[in-house]
């Protein structure tokens, strides 16, 4: 039986530690929530999508990105020293491993490139029915969401066990997502 992520209203640091422990116990490649996104109207009509290349214990994005390449413009992030996200276009070329993350090797487009996207597919450690997102703690995506504005559809990928029925704690700078995709459902946030 899987352990479910159950955040209490304590510190976000404690919630992240619990979420990472749950995630570490999940089988690698068990979760493919990205597959549900292919039928979402927001993805079907998109011309530019910002996404990320998932790591082993994250919900898998590889199949989705490989399916979408050539169909839409894909931007992948590059984490800068100040924790902002720069972006580069990805067309299927080999990625470069930097600081434990996979980054595109093409020309950097700048942090403002996020303003060109229709959809932002974001990672997270947990989420709730309000669209609150527990990230890794650097605020990278919160800043990217603010820079992008409210128009791009923001969707977070989670393992089923990482969706919380309890409201997550939020700081004033936290930005919410508009949907959460798990392997079994696409949860639209009202």
Please give the residue ranges for each predicted region.
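Surface-exposed, charge/polar-rich loops and edge strands
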Residues: 1-12, 21-25, 70-71, 105-106, ...
